[in-house]
């Protein structure tokens, strides 16, 4: 097998992360967001010559591009104040002046799209009540706004009809149960369109071009999600699209001529884009993307172009544009750091194993270049966040970094992961800290079957809820893993459930994990904090000081409890971070520190990347 050049954390993390798509009114430029500067800022790219231009220059707070304004003379964007997941809307004028158009430091603002005449846009904000989102119409010239819907319940905006007479909302009763509602703006009346018995997911509804029908995602009578069409005149609904796995979502082009769908393949974990011609009934996909997932498509106002992102294991997310007239597809960005040779990256393998009870668990396996069949490599069991998330194929610089340094990585889609059917998704209901964790323990048996993994040197690592799983493994399966790494994961599910952000849907969380009032004994029994006396193997915890999802106290208390019982723990706190690592300098430092921790505990030849004290605070 070929060997690979070894790279630093900085070289992997210097790959840009890009998102957001907005065409200029003349369709000659595209607005997008990139962290090429080290933090998210707004950029634009010219379609004719491929030139890029940075438009905002934030040094501390994330900025997300939204749209051009006023014939592309101004830019609409959102700013995350303090990186605490509270966003305000701002306008960037040609002079460089920024104007704030939504109030409040503890407010979330969500932009939904433009009116048919492009003179106004729609946005929801929770400034009146942090638990609820009111819908407004903003004038593009004056930024004056008019209330469209005042929320009395937790409804989520889906779509507004072209004539602005009706709005589609979704409402969840439980984690696996939701409905679509039609709101009559003039009558101020809300009507349920998808009344049903039992648990059925109905979500992501859109109007068709002339607003005579509603298309929405459902799993009614099916293990996977599909598209239904509801005729508003007759009330009849019919299935119009199914796939081998979930249809993730669907939407119409501004002219109504095309419908775009994204479909998840549970066998490859790749996401494909299907383009439906509403006039001819034909369906086609873009060629050249068989090994990559397509995401986040936007069709231009004229309907001539569709822009989208494509991402693969060895190809970070890049922006593409397809011309429906010429049938040419053009790549507009190159995100991978030029210092990294794509051939040195590792393509993941789709594998699976049978867990303790026989349930098949889908996984992704990264095997380092140069690993021999008789080798004894250390390994990481990589646990994704959620609960209800998943790990898919796609560029993951942090995983490639560890693989590049000799670690086999097995990404486990434990029971409860999204994308593998309704039955699999609901299999972790009120079972956190038990069955999903046991799936991760069973992953060691699969690693042993490979022949080239030293199962005495297997570490469990995860972020967010994956971090909780790592701590749970250290506490409840204390002899299974050589060490555990927790990145911003909760340790006390009782206090976490009591202090959820107000804008979260508590019912969905309680349904999946447990209600702190009714299920406190259950939550205590699966909270690592109350079982720290069992932790004997090395643990590393990394935490953002301003984390709104997993507050710092969750990690502070866990570290104190482990030390109180004599357990080994290393602790890093990042003073200018929230949930995860948004700033590149922090990501570089964090993953260097993790590698140092792994090497110190698993390898005889320690790579001294940076000093790694038992506890440290990392400042901006």
Regions found by a protein language model. Give the residues of each.
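Beta-strand C-termini and the immediately following turn/loop, strongest in propeller blades
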Residues: 30-37, 56, 75-83, 115-116, ...
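Blade-terminus and WD-like Trp-Asp/Gly-His loop motifs, strongest in beta-propeller folds
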Residues: 21-29, 66-74, 112-120, 158-166, ...
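Structural motif
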Residues: 39-43, 84-90, 130-136, 176-181, ...
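Active-site-proximal cap/loop segments of hydrolase catalytic domains
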Residues: 414-620
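Multi-bladed beta-propeller domains
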Residues: 1-18, 45-64, 82, 91-108, ...
């Amino acid at each position: 097998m070929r060997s690979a050049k070894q790279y630093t954390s900085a070289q992997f993390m210097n790959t840009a992360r890009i998102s957001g798509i907005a065409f200029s009114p003349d369709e000659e430029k595209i607005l997008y967001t990139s962290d090429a500067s080290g933090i998210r800022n707004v950029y634009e790219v010219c379609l004719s010559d491929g030139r890029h231009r940075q438009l905002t220059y934030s040094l501390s707070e994330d900025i997300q591009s939204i749209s051009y304004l006023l014939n592309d003379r101004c830019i609409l964007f959102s700013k995350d104040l303090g990186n605490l997941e509270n966003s305000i809307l701002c306008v960037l004028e040609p002079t460089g002046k920024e104007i704030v158009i939504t109030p409040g430091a503890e407010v979330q603002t969500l932009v939904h799209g433009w009116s048919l005449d492009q003179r106004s846009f729609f946005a929801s904000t929770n400034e009146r009540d942090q638990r609820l989102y009111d819908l407004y119409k903003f004038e593009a010239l004056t930024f004056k706004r008019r209330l469209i819907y005042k929320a009395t319940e937790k409804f989520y905006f889906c779509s507004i009809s072209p004539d602005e007479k009706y709005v589609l909302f979704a409402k969840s009763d439980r984690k696996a149960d939701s409905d679509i509602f039609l709101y009559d703006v003039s009558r101020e009346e809300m009507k349920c369109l998808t009344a049903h018995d039992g648990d059925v997911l109905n979500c992501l509804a859109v109007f068709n071009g002339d607003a005579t029908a509603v298309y929405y995602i459902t799993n009614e009578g099916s293990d996977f999600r599909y598209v239904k069409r509801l005729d508003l005149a007759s009330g009849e609904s019919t299935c119009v699209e199914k796939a081998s796995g979930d249809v993730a979502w669907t939407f119409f082009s501004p002219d109504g001529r095309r419908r775009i769908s994204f479909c998840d393949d549970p066998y490859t974990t790749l996401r494909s884009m299907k383009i439906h011609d509403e006039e001819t009934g034909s369906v086609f996909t873009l060629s050249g993307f068989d090994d990559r997932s397509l995401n986040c498509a936007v069709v231009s106002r004229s309907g001539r172009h569709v822009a989208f992102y494509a991402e693969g294991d060895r190809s970070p997310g890049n922006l593409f544009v397809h011309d429906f007239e010429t049938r040419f597809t053009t790549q507009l960005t190159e995100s991978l750091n030029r210092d990294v040779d794509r051939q040195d990256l590792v393509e993941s393998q789709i594998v699976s194993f049978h867990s303790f009870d026989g349930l098949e668990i889908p996984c992704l396996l990264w095997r380092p270049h140069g690993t021999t069949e008789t080798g004894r490599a250390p390994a990481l069991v990589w646990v994704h966040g959620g609960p209800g998330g998943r790990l898919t194929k796609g560029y993951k610089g942090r995983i490639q970094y560890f693989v590049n340094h000799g670690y086999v990585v097995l990404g486990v889609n434990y029971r409860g992961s999204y994308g593998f059917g309704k039955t699999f998704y609901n299999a972790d209901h009120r079972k956190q800290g038990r069955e999903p964790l046991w799936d991760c323990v069973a992953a060691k048996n699969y690693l042993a079957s490979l022949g080239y993994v030293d199962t005495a040197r297997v570490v469990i690592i995860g972020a967010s809820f994956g971090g909780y799983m790592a701590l749970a493994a250290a506490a409840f399966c204390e002899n299974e893993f050589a060490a555990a790494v927790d990145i911003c994961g909760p340790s006390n599910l009782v206090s976490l459930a009591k202090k959820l952000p107000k804008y979260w849907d508590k019912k969905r969380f309680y349904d999946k994990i447990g209600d702190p009032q009714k299920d406190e004994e259950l939550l205590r029994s699966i909270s690592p904090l109350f079982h720290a006396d069992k932790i004997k193997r090395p643990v590393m915890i990394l935490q953002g000081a301003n984390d709104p999802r997993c507050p710092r106290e969750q990690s502070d208390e866990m570290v104190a409890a482990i030390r109180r019982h004599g357990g080994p723990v290393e602790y890093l706190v990042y003073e200018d971070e929230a949930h995860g690592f948004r700033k590149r300098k922090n990501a570089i430092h964090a993953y260097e520190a993790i590698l140092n921790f792994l090497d110190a505990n698993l390898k005889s030849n320690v790579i001294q990347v940076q000093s790694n004290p038992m506890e440290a605070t990392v400042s901006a």
